[in-house]
């Protein structure tokens, strides 16, 4: 099993979620986060003043999948989050040793 953590543009998250759900990937944890990568930040005008925004709003999506679904999920996220501009995000793939469903005690792949 692998945990896929994806940081994507907040405005692209609805497309990412729809793409995953369309292929049967429903279980996920979603967190509103702020961050930045190589793009740095951006300048905005607010009440006639220029302000530097160094941390941009993003969405962090966490989903645990069986090993044979990892590449499909990565492809769905990349295809739906892509704009081609700096700030599209990152995907991290992390090994998961075990999962326990609290309600039933099921473990491993059966608990997903």
Swiss-Prot record:
Keywords: ATP-binding, Cytoplasm, Nucleotide-binding
Taxonomy, superkingdom: Archaea
Location in the cell: Cytoplasm
Any GO CC annotation of this UniProt entry: cytosol
Disulfide bonds: none
Residues annotated to bind ATP: 29, 38-39, 64, 87-90, 101-103
Activity control mechanisms: Binding of adenosine nucleotides results in distinct, cooperative behavior for ATP and ADP. GlnK2 is completely insensitive to 2-oxoglutarate at a low level of intracellular nitrogen.
GO annotation, biological process: regulation of nitrogen utilization
Alphabetized PANTHER family for the sequence: NITROGEN REGULATORY PROTEIN P-II, NITROGEN REGULATORY PROTEIN P-II HOMOLOG
Self-association state and partner proteins as the record states: Homotrimer. Interacts and forms a complex with Amt2.
Family in the record: Belongs to the P(II) protein family.
Protein name, as recorded: Nitrogen regulatory protein GlnK2
Gene of this entry: glnK2
């Amino acid at each position: 099993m692998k945990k896929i953590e994806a940081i994507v543009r907040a405005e692209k998250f609805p497309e990412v979620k729809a793409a995953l759900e369309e292929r049967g990937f429903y279980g996920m944890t979603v967190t509103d986060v702020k961050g930045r990568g190589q793009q740095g930040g951006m300048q905005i005008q607010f009440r006639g003043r220029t302000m530097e925004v160094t941390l941009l709003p993003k969405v962090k999506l966490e989903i645990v999948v069986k090993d044979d679904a990892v590449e499909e999920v990565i492809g769905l996220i990349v295809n739906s989050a892509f704009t081609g501009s700096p700030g599209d995000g990152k995907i991290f793939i992390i090994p998961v040793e075990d999962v326990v469903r609290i309600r039933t005690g099921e473990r491993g792949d059966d608990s997903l």
